[in-house]
């Protein structure tokens, strides 16, 4: 066996796997009955109103309950699975909607403005203080409200909304009267004049006022901070549509192919089809979904046969501008999308299909046989500007995520890559910086701007004796946004033979490795909220780690060839040694080209909770065994995780 292993066997029976229950101070975690909040994604303020209900702190107690963002009034199967595993006697509460497919115990519906008064009365019969947030249709207003929402959790007070463009606020003052409130924390530059006359007023006019008050509350409540969330509030804004067109066509494809001694022999038909697409002048978001229909093959059609369906879109100059592969999307389907800015002409969509078994490395061999219909659904949205979130509404999760970790938030629509300046720079371009290196300079300027904003906000921590503990300790930085809303930095690469350009990285956000940055994203904002819930309540859902079930604390390190050995010896082995002091069971594997089947038999990738891999591969799939007749059938892709 040519696999290289280093076993570190120090055993410690208990260790923290996650930060599940909030424990930012020595308070007791107090839960008055288990509740799960299902929140509509149709308006971002529903999530803001619910956050201080699901997460709150007092001088002696604290409470954290799951909050799940629901897309389109339908509770997903994965969300239902989480609910069933969380606890059997939870009270299920929906905010802002009535689920179409799931029975709940209590429902609160209505506009965010009116709902804020109802929730305050129901959850805070008496409160000497309240957080008053503005609500209108302007992103700047939402930004201020989003930034200040964690304060309601830290000071355990209700959120009440007001429209700064209206003169009458009778319902607001009636609610304050019923709460018996004496102090109000008001956000916004135009607040009702009655606040000054009738209450002790703490006025937060701008983002700096909010951050200073937030940091004071954190210092008083927790004495430390180890979490900051970066997000872009503009991701709740829809595309600025000028026109929209859909087209669906079906193209038959059939082929039988053999792979012998590394060469492909097409015995019948063709494994590739092309389609010409005419793009007019203007700004367009173009997307295509390709799905296989009515599959006929000598191989089973029960999901067990490996399928590689890929699509490549090239511009009029023949340059790749978008690529999709079924292992990264769905079984029997793939998807591509791109932003085209004033680059009209004839584009080419190329679709390739493999359906069968294939393996080997130096001597590729295999067979593919399929007859199917490719359904091509094209969607072209003509836009007035370049605003283009890849994953909409992620910022809706920011308040709850931040509050659960006792942190602060940094939010600004100026973090967007696809702004007005980008539209000028990307004129006559058909893709983003990932395929076009000429766009990377502006992309990196935007990253540096975000970093400067991060540093400016972190400097405020010094005024509250929180700075050193954050940047010199285990400070976490959550990047809650896609790479158009919070772009990655592109390092230069000499791999010019690849269609992709540069090496994207979030490392600059670490501030020279003084912070631990990570993207908190999934396919949708709803999926992301579920990811957050699974993380916060990991032990409650999966059970606490026990000596009998060591899977919880196993951490496997794998390094491959092609300079992967350097990372294995100088990073992974020392890091594994460090982790053992926290109770992890660690093993370091050197995965050579001809040892992958051995790694598979040793369950290197499956019999462990954590895996760190240094080697070649794609983000969306990995082949643990590159030899054997069916190596691609043994691959693990994002599609398996998703389904």
Question: Model regions: which residues?
Answer:
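N-terminal intrinsically disordered, low-complexity tails enriched in polar/charged
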Residues: 19-27, 499-501, 512
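Secretory targeting signatures
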Residues: 1-21, 46, 144
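Alpha-helical transmembrane segments and their helix-helix packing motifs
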Residues: 20-274, 280, 296, 303-315, ...
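Intrinsically disordered, low-complexity serine/threonine-rich segments
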Residues: 7, 12-14, 87, 560, ...
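Hydrophobic alpha-helix position signal
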Residues: 15-16, 176, 579
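Compositionally biased, low-structure terminal segments
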Residues: 5-8, 12, 16, 55, ...
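Cysteine-dependent hydrolase recognition
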Residues: 158-163, 180, 194-294, 299, ...
């Amino acid at each position: 066996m040519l696999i290289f292993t280093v076993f570190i066997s120090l055993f410690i029976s208990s260790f923290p796997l996650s930060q599940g229950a909030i424990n930012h101070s020595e308070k007791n975690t107090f839960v008055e009955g288990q509740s799960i909040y299902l929140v509509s994604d149709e308006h971002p303020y529903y999530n803001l109103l619910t956050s201080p209900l699901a997460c709150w702190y007092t001088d002696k107690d604290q409470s954290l309950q799951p909050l799940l963002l629901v897309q389109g009034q339908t509770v997903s199967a994965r969300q239902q699975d989480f609910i069933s595993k969380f606890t059997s006697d939870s009270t299920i509460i929906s905010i802002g909607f009535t689920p179409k497919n799931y029975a709940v115990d209590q429902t609160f519906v209505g506009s965010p403005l009116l709902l804020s008064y109802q929730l305050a009365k129901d959850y805070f019969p008496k409160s000497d203080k309240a957080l008053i947030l503005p609500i209108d249709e302007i992103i700047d207003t939402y930004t201020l409200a989003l930034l200040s929402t964690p304060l309601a959790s830290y000071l355990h007070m209700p959120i009440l909304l007001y429209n700064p463009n209206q003169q009458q606020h009778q319902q607001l003052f009636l609610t304050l009267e019923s709460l018996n409130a004496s102090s109000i924390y008001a956000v916004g530059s135009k607040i009702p004049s009655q606040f000054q006359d009738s209450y002790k007023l703490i006025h937060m006019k701008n983002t700096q006022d909010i951050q200073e008050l937030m940091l004071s509350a954190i210092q008083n409540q927790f004495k430390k901070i180890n979490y900051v969330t970066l997000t872009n509030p503009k991701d709740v804004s829809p595309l600025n549509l000028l026109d929209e067109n859909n087209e669906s066509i079906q193209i038959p494809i059939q082929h039988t192919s053999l792979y012998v001694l590394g060469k492909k022999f097409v015995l019948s038909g063709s494994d590739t089809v092309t389609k010409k697409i005419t793009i007019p002048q203007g700004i367009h978001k173009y997307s295509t979904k390709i799905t296989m229909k009515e599959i006929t093959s000598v191989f089973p059609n029960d999901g067990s046969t490996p399928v590689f369906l890929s699509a490549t879109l090239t511009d009029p100059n023949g340059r790749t501008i978008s690529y999709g592969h079924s292992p990264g999307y769905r079984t029997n389907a793939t998807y591509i999308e791109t932003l085209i800015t004033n680059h009209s002409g004839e584009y080419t969509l190329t679709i390739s299909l493999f359906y069968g078994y294939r393996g080997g490395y130096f001597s590729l061999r295999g067979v593919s046989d399929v007859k199917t219909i490719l359904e091509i659904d094209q969607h072209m949205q003509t836009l007035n500007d370049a605003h283009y979130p890849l994953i909409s509404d992620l910022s809706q999760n920011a308040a709850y995520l931040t509050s659960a970790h006792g942190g602060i938030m940094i939010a600004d629509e100026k973090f967007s890559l696809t702004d007005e300046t980008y539209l000028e720079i990307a004129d006559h371009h058909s893709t983003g910086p990932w395929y076009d290196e000429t766009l990377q300079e502006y992309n990196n300027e935007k990253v540096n701007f975000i970093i400067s904003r991060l540093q400016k906000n972190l400097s405020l921590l010094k005024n509250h004796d929180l700075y050193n503990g954050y940047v010199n300790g285990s400070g976490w930085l959550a990047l809650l946004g896609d790479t158009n809303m919070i772009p990655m930095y592109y390092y230069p690469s000499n791999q010019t033979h690849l269609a992709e350009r540069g090496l994207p990285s979030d490392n600059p956000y670490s501030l020279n490795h003084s912070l631990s940055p990570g993207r908190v994203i999934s396919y949708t904002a709803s999926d992301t909220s579920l990811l957050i819930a699974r993380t916060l309540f990991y032990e409650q859902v999966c059970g606490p780690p026990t000596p009998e079930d060591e899977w919880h604390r196993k951490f496997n390190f794998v390094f491959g060839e092609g300079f992967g050995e350097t990372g294995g010896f100088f990073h992974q082995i020392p890091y594994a040694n460090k982790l053992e002091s926290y109770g992890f069971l660690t093993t370091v594997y050197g995965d050579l080209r001809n040892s992958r089947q051995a790694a598979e038999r040793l369950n290197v990738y499956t019999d462990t909770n954590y895996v760190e891999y240094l080697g070649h591969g794609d983000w969306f799939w990995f082949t643990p065994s590159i030899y054997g007749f069916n190596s691609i059938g043994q691959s693990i892709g994002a599609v398996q995780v998703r389904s």
